[in-house]
Amino acid sequence: MDKPRKENEEEPQSAPKTDEERPPVEHSPEKQSPEEQSSEEQSSEEEFFPEELLPELLPEMLLSEERPPQEGLSRKDLFEGRPPMEQPPCGVGKHKLEEGSFKERLARSRPQFKGDIHGRNLSNEEMIQAADELEEMKRVRNKLMIMHWKAKRSRPYPI
């Protein structure tokens, strides 16, 4: 019990230091020569990036340094500088904007792709029947996935 008190009493006495005991203040990096700065930067890089990782990170660091700063560009200027998009983003294309069900669109597109169906003489009815089968398979698959999802999460504890 006496030891912790003595240690606590010694600490306040050693806390205030005079100007003579303080280490000399280092000069700001602005006043140092470029050679001193580069050696300090190298040592700090070595601390943060071990030599094994340095070759992997080097190309990324070089690429980031070569980029010209884009100062003073407003959002408007950035958008004007970009070329217009050739195709709309996914989900906004023609196939989503066309009216009609999947089967109707498939039947309409058949004449466009006649050359792609090599030697197949499919009538519109056959194509619609195949589309019905595909839709049925999708529905069954989705039902099974939902049932599986519910079964996994209905337990009081994870499996």
Swiss-Prot record:
Family: Belongs to the TFS-II family. TFA subfamily.
InterPro entries from the UniProt entry: TF_A-like/BEX (IPR021156)
Keywords, sorted A to Z: Nucleus, Transcription, Transcription regulation
Role noted for this protein: May be involved in transcriptional regulation. Modulates various viral and cellular promoters in a promoter context-dependent manner. Does not bind DNA directly.
Highest taxon of source: Eukaryota
Record-level GO cellular component terms: nucleoplasm
Ranges of biased composition (kind: Acidic residues): 37-54
Signal sequence segment: none
Pfam families on file: BEX
UniProt key word Transport: no
Protein name: Transcription elongation factor A protein-like 1
Chain spans, region Disordered: 1-121
Subcellular location: Nucleus
Transmembrane segments: none
Ranges annotated as biased composition (Basic and acidic residues): 17-34, 64-80, 95-119
